């Protein structure tokens, strides 16, 4: 599997490079970084004390010409440029970027008509199994329980609520036969009045080096149920991304997520 990594100098990019280098079935063939990055020209394995012979570059076409797959955990504007390059070079994509606009998501979906794409806000096995648990719980706590989603991430995260929190909200809302767009309440402030019993509330915490904590609270009278997932390392995301690459190796064009990859549908 000839794999290139986007955002190669970032925290997730470094973890992905390490995962690819340690996988006997994978070959690192490219490492992309943003234009103007101070790390351009540096060996992709320098962060690990290894010499890979692959230099960090901002030349999209040069990297895509060598790759069969690109793993992308960057930002929406970067990912959209990567999608365009992938279409030019017929490269399959594993995308963990969050914060897309509706228009950008539509472009991503259109691209999946020509190339294989796995798009998931969270690629850990644990989170995706948790989504199934939430669907089950929501169906049984549909009356008399208020639903709130609390997430916490490191100080550098730029979007809120997290993509994973939104995935959890969509799983719960879908199980209840609702649209998250219609029932979500984000970041209450001031005099808000009584809680709408059909709403799903979101709260976001940012600080320190928190990798990612998510709790869905079902609060009833006399009891509450909390379903929590906590990430202590980005290793689970990197391993999930490689699992997604393997999944795409046996697929043609189409848009998939980790529920497809893990056979949880």
From Swiss-Prot:
Belongs to the DapB family. It is found in: Cytoplasm. GO terms for cellular component: cytosol. (S)-2,3,4,5-tetrahydrodipicolinate binds at residues 154, 163-164. SUPFAM superfamilies: Glyceraldehyde-3-phosphate dehydrogenase-like, C-terminal domain (SSF55347), NAD(P)-binding Rossmann-fold domains (SSF51735). The active site is at 153 (proton donor/acceptor), 157 (proton donor). It catalyses: (S)-2,3,4,5-tetrahydrodipicolinate + NAD(+) + H2O = (2S,4S)-4-hydroxy-2,3,4,5-tetrahydrodipicolinate + NADH + H(+); (S)-2,3,4,5-tetrahydrodipicolinate + NADP(+) + H2O = (2S,4S)-4-hydroxy-2,3,4,5-tetrahydrodipicolinate + NADPH + H(+). GO terms for biological process: diaminopimelate biosynthetic process; lysine biosynthetic process via diaminopimelate. The gene is dapB. NADP(+) binds at residue 34. HAMAP family: DapB (MF_00102). Gene3D superfamilies: Dihydrodipicolinate Reductase, domain 2, NAD(P)-binding Rossmann-like Domain. GO terms for molecular function: 4-hydroxy-tetrahydrodipicolinate reductase; NAD binding; NADP binding; oxidoreductase activity, acting on CH or CH2 groups, NAD or NADP as acceptor. This is 4-hydroxy-tetrahydrodipicolinate reductase. Its EC number is 1.17.1.8. Pathway: Amino-acid biosynthesis; L-lysine biosynthesis via DAP pathway; (S)-tetrahydrodipicolinate from L-aspartate: step 4/4. InterPro entries: DapB_C, DapB_N, DapB_N_CS, DHDPR_bac, NAD(P)-bd_dom_sf. Keywords: Amino-acid biosynthesis, Cytoplasm, Diaminopimelate biosynthesis, Lysine biosynthesis, NAD, NADP, Oxidoreductase. It comes from the Bacteria. Catalyzes the conversion of 4-hydroxy-tetrahydrodipicolinate (HTPA) to tetrahydrodipicolinate. NAD(+) binds at residues 7-12, 33, 96-98, 120-123.
